[in-house]
Amino acid sequence: MTERVDPKKLIKGGLHDWEVVIGMEIHAQVTSRSKLFSGASTEFGGEPNDHVSLVDAAMPGMLPVINEECVAQAVRTGLGLKAQINLRSVFDRKNYFYPDLPQGYQISQYKDPIVGEGEVLVDLPEGESMTVGIERLHLEQDAGKSLHDQDPTKSFVDLNRSGVALMEIVSRPDLRSSEEARAYVTKLRTILRYLGTCDGDMEKGSLRADVNVSVRRPGEPLGTRCEIKNVNSIRFIGQAIETEARRQIAILEDGGKIDQETRLYDPGKGETRSMRSKEEAHDYRYFPDPDLLPLEFDQAYVDALASGLPELPDAKKARFIKDFGLSAYDAGVLVAERASADYFEAVARGRDGKAAANWVINELFGRLNKEGRSIEDTPVSAEQLGTIVDLIGDGVISGKIAKDLFEIVWSEGGDPRAIVEARGMKQVTDTGAIEAAVDAIIAANPDKVEQAKAKPTLLGWFVGQTMKATGGKANPAAVNALLKDKLGIE
């Protein structure tokens, strides 16, 4: 079957249009207190080689012992990816030499991974979505870290990270643009955070991406791919794909051919650089690790873990749309972070869901973004924001005054109801007072009155003037009704 090509995703070269094909290998650090095969701490930071056991340092005679929590976290992740959980998997030795790999091999999984095929539903701009296939998820050890800036003539090795459990999540080459790739990684990180299986902190290296990029003319077979290693931000993932795709297009249009290789993205120079020729599986001489038995568990173990899973983003989004009447876009924004979704639910409980979403997304998120703060660091609690929504709904304050009240609560804290009482912020509902303000504005603007009778949209100007005259405290509905009556507008 011929694959359908979206013209909007094609990259224009000097001679032809080109399609970019992208597959991702995400390395997600497993959330656990100890490493995959030792009891050493996984805590970030600390002095070099503080969190190292004899197993991590590959001392002779030291044997690996599987960390059951890492196994459980991998199974939870597989379930969250709607993937096949393999009841039997095998750990293999992946043989290669790095100075910061003390064993001379990495314990990974090759032919028999713990998790098989799955999928991720990815939300795209303009309300579109796509399904990205997951090929596999396997457990493996992280390597240590070589330090080259401590001495001009020597390199040092820090093994704190050596042996930390990683989940390598391999996607199918289903992505066709840098935007899709960024959206995929964002969604995958959200799922991992909901599950509590990886914190997704790319700055600390908890989530790293290897990006496989190739280009082809539409309808042609897949081109030769290059792998861009260890991209550590979602923004850089997009830039690396664009840069590498254009490099390959330039070579092909010049009559050259693409060498299969591993490359590194340099965001400072905006280029990818060759690291080494890309290895094939046989180069690593995989074989089952003789120190580890095959990993086996039964379906009851999987079912027990499945029963403890939290509500995941797709299910939560569907529920927000159904229960609170939200648009797909607003629901998607709210479920992007678990803490944001929990905050919204606390505000919306027993209230108008759309009003609650409006205040959380536009006012709260807007202010948090402006100040570079996270939802966990908000000075306005869900209870306080819920009270502000109640005060508007009950007609106690107007929308304009509510924004002033939000600023006070943000800066000073306190009970919104008490602040409204103490500062005289209640909405003016006395029709006599509102009528006096309306009459004064009509009397002062006879020319506008005549224009409004011919052009009813000018009513908004009179409403604005009345609200201004009453300090924003007049009830907007009462103002509208009075003005329509006095101006003779239907």
From Swiss-Prot:
Its EC number is 6.3.5.-. It comes from the Bacteria. Keywords: ATP-binding, Ligase, Nucleotide-binding, Protein biosynthesis. GO terms for molecular function: asparaginyl-tRNA synthase (glutamine-hydrolyzing) activity; ATP binding; glutaminyl-tRNA synthase (glutamine-hydrolyzing) activity. It catalyses: L-glutamyl-tRNA(Gln) + L-glutamine + ATP + H2O = L-glutaminyl-tRNA(Gln) + L-glutamate + ADP + phosphate + H(+); L-aspartyl-tRNA(Asn) + L-glutamine + ATP + H2O = L-asparaginyl-tRNA(Asn) + L-glutamate + ADP + phosphate + 2 H(+). One of its GO terms (biological process) is translation. It holds the Pfam family GatB_Yqey. SMART domains: GatB_Yqey. It is an enzyme of class 6 (ligase). Heterotrimer of A, B and C subunits. Belongs to the GatB/GatE family. GatB subfamily. HAMAP family: GatB. Allows the formation of correctly charged Asn-tRNA(Asn) or Gln-tRNA(Gln) through the transamidation of misacylated Asp-tRNA(Asn) or Glu-tRNA(Gln) in organisms which lack either or both of asparaginyl-tRNA or glutaminyl-tRNA synthetases. The reaction takes place in the presence of glutamine and ATP through an activated phospho-Asp-tRNA(Asn) or phospho-Glu-tRNA(Gln). This is Aspartyl/glutamyl-tRNA(Asn/Gln) amidotransferase subunit B. It comes from Methylorubrum extorquens (strain PA1). The gene is gatB.
